[in-house]
Regions:
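Sensory/regulatory domains in signal-transduction proteins
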Residues: 43-159
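Acidic, metal-coordinating catalytic segment for phosphate/diphosphate chemistry
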Residues: 35-45
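Short, low-complexity N-terminal regulatory "tails/caps" that precede and couple sensory modules
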Residues: 1-33
């Protein structure tokens, strides 16, 4: 499902910066090749939004809301930007998988990041898919305070 790119706004550019810098901090490697000093924020946001694998982020709180999903995530979940952003992130997984998902998120929060997570997710239309070898990492703001978590994966298939 096509969606307008959500990267042009200043706040989305800042969120993209947090996603990329936090990924670099957690895994000692860039999430995308263009996340290099000297590239414009707008260009980096375009590349993150258009990269070929899903990237999502949610905020903090007891039932965190999705803050970001790139084009690959929007297509996989079958949602438009305005449907995905603001949705409780727990709804990306089937109800019976949410406890396992929360355990992984808690582990990633405790360790700052994890890799190798696998689980079941569910699209807007109810279609289930498996994800494998996902990376989950903590988002850190300029004051070194946790402001959310992000995840990405490139290995998935319909169940």
């Amino acid at each position: 499902m096509a969606s307008e790119a959500a990267w042009p706004t200043t706040d989305k550019q800042e969120l993209a910066r947090l996603l990329l810098e936090s990924h670099q901090r957690a895994f000692s490697r860039p999430l995308i090749a263009s996340a290099q000093p000297g590239h414009s924020k707008r260009l980096i946001c375009q590349h993150l939004f258009a990269c070929g694998f899903p990237v999502l982020a949610h905020g903090t709180g007891s039932d965190p809301l999705i803050l970001y999903g790139n084009s690959a995530a929007l297509q996989l979940w079958g949602l438009r930007w305005e449907q995905l952003v603001g949705m409780p992130s727990r709804l990306t997984a089937p109800e019976e998988e949410r406890s396992e998902r929360q355990t992984a998120l808690t582990e990633a929060q405790t360790k700052e990041a994890i890799r190798g997570y696998s689980g079941t997710r569910i699209s807007q239309g109810g279609r289930r898919f498996q994800i494998r070898d996902a990376r989950i990492w903590t988002l850190w703001n300029e004051d070194n305070l946790c402001c959310g978590q992000a995840a990405c994966f490139s290995d998935w298939w319909w169940s």
